[in-house]
Amino acid sequence: MNVIHIAETVKGGVATVINNLTENNEIDSHVICPESQSKEIYCAQKTLFSRTGRNISSLSSLFLVIIKTLKYNKFDVIHLHSSFAGFIVRALFAFKLINKKKYKVIYTPHCFSFIMDTKKWKKKVYIYIERILAKQTDCIIANSYYEYKCAVDAGISKNKIKVVYNAVSLDGQEKLERIKKCNENEVQKEKINILFVGRFDKQKGYDYLLNVIKVADVSKYTFNIIGDSVHDVFEKIEKENVVYYGWVDNKELPAYFCENDVLLMPSRWESFGLVAVEAQLYGVPVIANNVASLPEVISDGLTGMLVNFEDANKVVEIMDSHTIHFWNEKKEACREFASNKFRKSDMVNSYVQIYKSY
C-alpha cells in the first residue's frame, strides 16, 4: 500500500503523528512537507516545498508540488494533515483538477479551525467549508471525543468520522531507561520546578501562565518555559525564578521533563494535548485547564489536576496546597496512564485499518 502524507506545516504534534505512521513496514510512505521543517520528518521519501509563512507564494508552492507529485507517482491513499493541506487538496478534487476516484482520502485536521476561540462569522465560514469538503473525504480523524462532538455538532456526518488518539512511543532501550531513571529521581529541592511547553499565544494560554507567575511566591517555584511566539512581539516576564529556553528539539524534551516536577497546561482549546501525555510518560503530573480535550488526556486527581486557569489566584492556591512529595507520589501513576492509554501501536494499527477499509 502506497500512502502519501501532505502537510502545510509539521510543527508540534503533526510531525510526531507522521513519523509514527511512516515507520510502519506494511506501508510505502511518502511525505510532502515544508523544506524549512524537513528535519522534523524522518521518512526517507520526501518532497519539499518552499514555505515562508501562510502567504500566497507558500501556498502556491505547495499547490504546484501536490499537482506534480500526484501526476508522476501512484498512491493508494492520500492522508491530509491540518486545515490548509486539507483545504487545498480537497478543493482540487471538488474542481475536478485531480480525479478523486483514484484515491482513498483521509483527513486529520489536528484541531478543526472552528474549534478555535474566534469571531462567530469566522466559525460559520470554517464550518461551511469543512462541511462542503467533507464530501471529498472518505474518513475524517478526530483526535479526541471532544473533537468528534464538535465536528458532529457542526453538521459533519458522524459516519465520516473516526476517533483515533495520538500516541507516545515507548520504543528504544535508551528511552525506557530514561523513563525509569526519571521516575526514580526524587532529589530534595528547595523549590518546585514548573514546566510550560508551547507557543506564546492565546490558544496555549500563555497569558494565563503569566498571570500565575505574577501571583506565585518567588521562593516556592521556578518556572521553566519552553517555546516562543509566532509573532515578534510578546510579553516576556522578568523575574528571578523564570527561565526562558526558546524552542528545543523534540529529542531534548525528555531531559526537561525529568528535571521538572509539574507541567502547567493552561490551553484555551486543544484537539488532543500531546505535551500532557508526553510529560506523564516521564512521570510528570499535569495541572491543566479544564477545557476541550484535556479531561481525556489527564486522570484528574490521579495523574494531575484539572482547574480553571481564568482564576490565577485559585490556581496558585491549589499549587501552594501541595508539596513536592505529593507530586512525586504521582510519578508511577502518570507513567502507567500514558503508556497504557496512548500506545503508539494502537494508534498506528487504527490508521492502517482505516487505510484498508475505505
From Swiss-Prot:
InterPro entries: Glyco_trans_1, Glyco_trans_4-like_N, Glycosyltransferase_grp1. Pfam families: Glyco_transf_4 (PF13439), Glycos_transf_1 (PF00534). It comes from the Bacteria. GO terms for molecular function: glycosyltransferase activity. Coiled coil: none annotated. This is Uncharacterized 41.2 kDa protein in cps region. It comes from Klebsiella pneumoniae. The lineage of its organism: Bacteria, Pseudomonadati, Pseudomonadota, Gammaproteobacteria, Enterobacterales.
